[in-house]
């Protein structure tokens, strides 16, 4: 596989979306430098990609967070406290 390529490729309604899946509470969601570079390059070339993380500090069903990677190599929290259905709806409307 290519270093840094996300876990999920989703093609829906003429949209091409990449999603990296994480389940941790570490800084930077535990993304490697290769993953960060992949997301930045993809974004700079007009692509859409997201990091979908399970917030392990939450015990509810609404424990998902959505992040994006932006310059200068920053991880930006876009949405929080989502269940899986709402997370996919948010990703589709971006």
Residue ranges and their predicted role:
Residues 1:
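A short acidic/basic microdomain associated with nuclease active sites
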Residues 4:
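Beta-rich catalytic cores
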Residues 8-10, 15-25:
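Conserved catalytic cores of phosphodiester-cleaving nucleases, focusing on short active-site segments
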Residues 25-36:
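Active-site-adjacent loop/helix micro-motif of nuclease/hydrolase catalytic cores
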Residues 32, 68-71, 83:
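Helix N-cap and loop-to-helix transition residues
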Residues 43-74:
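Nucleic-acid nuclease catalytic cores
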Residues 78-94:
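Charged phosphate-binding loop/patch that engages nucleotide di/tri-phosphates or the phosphate backbone
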């Amino acid at each position: 596989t290519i270093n840094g390529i996300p876990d999920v490729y989703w093609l829906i309604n003429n949209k091409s979306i990449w999603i990296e899946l994480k389940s941790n509470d570490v800084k930077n969601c535990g993304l490697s430098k290769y993953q960060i570079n992949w997301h930045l390059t993809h974004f700079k070339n007009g692509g859409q990609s997201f990091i979908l993380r399970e917030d392990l500090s939450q015990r509810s069903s609404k424990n998902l967070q959505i992040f994006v990677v932006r310059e200068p190599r920053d991880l930006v929290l876009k949405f929080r406290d989502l269940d899986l259905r709402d997370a996919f709806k948010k990703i589709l409307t971006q």
